[in-house]
Curated annotation (Swiss-Prot):
InterPro entries: Cytidylyl_trans, KdsB, Nucleotide-diphossugar_trans. Its main location: cytoplasm. This is 3-deoxy-manno-octulosonate cytidylyltransferase. Activates KDO (a required 8-carbon sugar) for incorporation into bacterial lipopolysaccharide in Gram-negative bacteria. It comes from the Bacteria. It comes from Bordetella pertussis (strain Tohama I / ATCC BAA-589 / NCTC 13251). Keywords: Cytoplasm, Lipopolysaccharide biosynthesis, Nucleotidyltransferase, Transferase. The gene is kdsB.
Length: 254
């Protein structure tokens, strides 16, 4: 199985300024992400950034980075530019690892890539784990996904899906026993041909209402398959508290 890992790293962040360059045990966060990705089975790991400072920081630690335009509306648009710059063939597979995931498990990267390889009818693969509790089911910041028996995504939503009619009757807020409720994890594998088409796809109503970019692909008829894992991976870094948690994890490892 051959695949490339691309790590989109946008320097601007409203909650955590200069997030890709935040120090984690002596190295920038984006470098820590690249180190984790390099432990996977990827043939190549490349950072795609909009700022020369990130490119320089990556190079200083021996990691390759490509400079992309600063005006991309999404990280997927940034990947589209990157695959063209790298000259990747249409049938190649790219795994998108977010630049704020310094604790990502290399085995998860491999598993999502393998899920796409095993599904020639699909353009995208992603990942999900069982919902932990009722709080997660009703939390709009926890994205849910429902799938077919062969792990094809039917829908992604911030709403509590599937809706357990009897268990939730009368306004109850519980996680019904046995409910096939899955928490979406934001790691993706793409076929390069899809990434090249993505910038031309128009936003649909579902994406606009849910604010979930993956719905754009589904609204245009693209198939997404979902790797199921038993437990949730470590959360990404979005806040100063998240950053301190990641720093502590690395300190404990060293």
């Amino acid at each position: 199985m051959s695949f490339t890992v691309l790590i989109p790293a946008r320097l601007a962040s409203t909650r955590l300024p200069d997030k890709p360059l935040a120090d984690i045990a002596g190295k920038p966060m984006v470098v820590r992400v690249a180190e984790r990705a390099a432990l996977s089975g990827a043939e190549r790991v490349m950072i795609a950034t909009d700022d020369a400072r990130v490119q320089q920081a990556a190079a200083a630690h021996g990691h390759a980075a490509i400079l992309t335009r600063p005006d991309h509306p999404t990280g997927t648009d940034r990947l589209s530019e990157a695959v063209d710059a790298l000259g990747l063939p249409d049938d190649a597979i790219v795994v998108n690892v977010q630049g704020d995931e310094p604790l990502i498990e290399p085995a998860l990267i491999d598993a999502v890539a393998a899920q796409l390889v095993a599904a020639p009818h699909a353009d995208i693969a992603t990942c999900a784990c069982p919902l932990a509790d009722a709080e997660a089911l009703f939390n709009p910041n926890v994205v849910k996904v429902v799938c077919t028996a062969d792990r094809r995504a039917l829908y992604f939503s911030r709403a509590p899906i599937p809706w357990a009619r009897d268990a939730l009757a009368g306004g109850a807020r519980v996680l019904a026993p046995g409910l096939p409720a899955w928490h979406h994890i934001g790691i993706y594998a793409y076929r390069v041909a899809f990434l090249r088409r993505f910038p031309a796809l128009s936003q649909g109503q579902l994406e606009r209402y849910e604010s979930l970019e993956q719905l754009r692909a589904m609204e245009h008829g693209h198939v997404i398959v979902v790797h199921h894992t038993d437990s949730a991976p470590a959360a990404g870094v979005d806040t100063p508290a998240d950053l301190e948690r990641a720093r502590a994890a690395y300190t404990n490892r060293l």
